Amino acid sequence: MIDKVFKEKADQSTDFRFDKKVVDVFDDMVVRSVPYYLEIQRMMVELANTFAKPNTNLYDLGCSTGTTMISMSKELDKSVGFVGIDESPQMLESCRNNLDANGVEQVVKLNSFDLNKGVEIENASVVILCLTLQFVRPLYRAKLIQSIYDQMNPGGAIILVEKVIGEGSDFNRKFIDYYYDYKRRNDYNDMEIAQKREALENILIPFKLSENIHMLEEAGFKDCETFFKWYNFTGLIAIK
């Protein structure tokens, strides 16, 4: 379905929620809103395939409609278990339907949980947060990353894809302008862009790239590398 969530003028702005209205159009929304989203997915599969060990688990925190796990299932060993976590029950329902429709052979467990409260991880060789940490309240992010590090298998990888803010205000403003131009090229009009920005204002709170790297290193992760960068979007991988 085509994303028309913000197509009509709203009487008043409300906070963005991953409800059924968003879930139904999410796949279109994310492809049109995140530069090189499908390439990011392909890159994450390559990276995960390097670190996902047989008979361990891959965690997808903020699994949404299951796109990442579906992509992973085609390349990863069938003995790698998948655990998808999302706070939205509607997302998890869509995720399960998509996993079944795509014939995913790995064992998949789906859980509804608020990452602001932490997460329980078992036998994990790969943990993915694709456009997820930015929705966790800043107060709880470092604690969540530390918890992931503490529970992961040694040698495991964390893959973090985030919207970020620029290190300096001048380029940050330019990058935001370029991003809005990108959305216009993908057929979002100015009203849609403005209304979504207002809805996300207190929900999606990006950090600087340097802040995300520091948070990973403070938790104990090493060999932190940037594998993707497009203006105000970035992908990081780090090893325990």
Language model: regions and residue ranges:
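N-terminal, positively charged/glycine-rich alpha-helical extensions of SAM-dependent methyltransferases
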Residues: 1-25
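Conserved alpha-helix/loop element of class I SAM-dependent methyltransferases that forms part
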Residues: 36-54
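Conserved class I S-adenosyl-L-methionine
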Residues: 55-64
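Class I SAM-dependent methyltransferase SAM/SAH-binding core
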Residues: 59, 68-117
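A conserved beta-strand element that flanks and buttresses the S-adenosyl-L-methionine
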Residues: 128
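A short glycine-rich, Lys/Arg-flanked "PGG" loop and its adjoining helix->strand segment in the class I
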Residues: 142-154
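Conserved beta-strand signature within the Rossmann-like core of class I S-adenosyl-L-methionine
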Residues: 155-163
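C-terminal alpha-helical "lid/dimerization" subdomain adjacent to the S-adenosyl-L-methionine
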Residues: 164-215
